[in-house]
Amino acid sequence: MDPVDPEMPPWHHPGSKPQTPCNNCYCKRCCYHCYVCFTKKGLGISHGRKKRRRPAAAASYPDNKDPVPEQHTGRKQKRQEEQEKKVEKETGPSGQPCHQDSCNSCTRISGQ
């Protein structure tokens, strides 16, 4: 067995290098190609440049706050009103079920 340089990383040891070069493909076979491909592609560990972060909002500006999404209640209220009107038509204004023959307060015409 040949002596191995202790300062050399393990993927550069003799016999540990794969026959094919590394590529940019992220398929399962290429992710397990070698130790370096596994850490970069399989685990997503990269010691390259970090992405630039957005600067933090200055605390001195009171108007600069995180936007809060508005609640859209107008549409819900319209739907509720329509449903209440529909229920009122079906039951009558007193809340009792409408009997077509004996209904005097409902706008229904008997025979419909």
Swiss-Prot record:
The chain residues annotated with the modification Asymmetric dimethylarginine are R52, R53
Where is the region Disordered?
45-112
**Single GO biological process annotation from the record:** positive regulation of viral transcription
Question: Record's superkingdom?
Answer: Viruses
Location of the region described as Cysteine-rich in the Swiss-Prot/TrEMBL record:
22-37
Q: Name one GO molecular function term.
A: protein domain specific binding
* Post-translational modification as stated in the protein's UniProt record: Asymmetrical arginine methylation by host PRMT6 seems to diminish the transactivation capacity of Tat and affects the interaction with host CCNT1. Acetylation by EP300, CREBBP, GCN5L2/GCN5 and PCAF regulates the transactivation activity of Tat. EP300-mediated acetylation of Lys-50 promotes dissociation of Tat from the TAR RNA through the competitive binding to PCAF's bromodomain. In addition, the non-acetylated Tat's N-terminus can also interact with PCAF. PCAF-mediated acetylation of Lys-28 enhances Tat's binding to CCNT1. Lys-50 is deacetylated by SIRT1.
According to the UniProt entry, which residues carry N6-acetyllysine?
K28, K50, K51
Where do the record's region annotations for Core lie? Answer: 38-48
Q: Where is the signal peptide, in residue numbers?
A: none
Would you identify the family this protein belongs to, as annotated? Answer: Belongs to the lentiviruses Tat family.
Name it. Answer: Protein Tat
Provide the organism lineage as a comma list.
Viruses, Riboviria, Pararnavirae, Artverviricota, Revtraviricetes
Q: Which gene encodes it?
A: tat
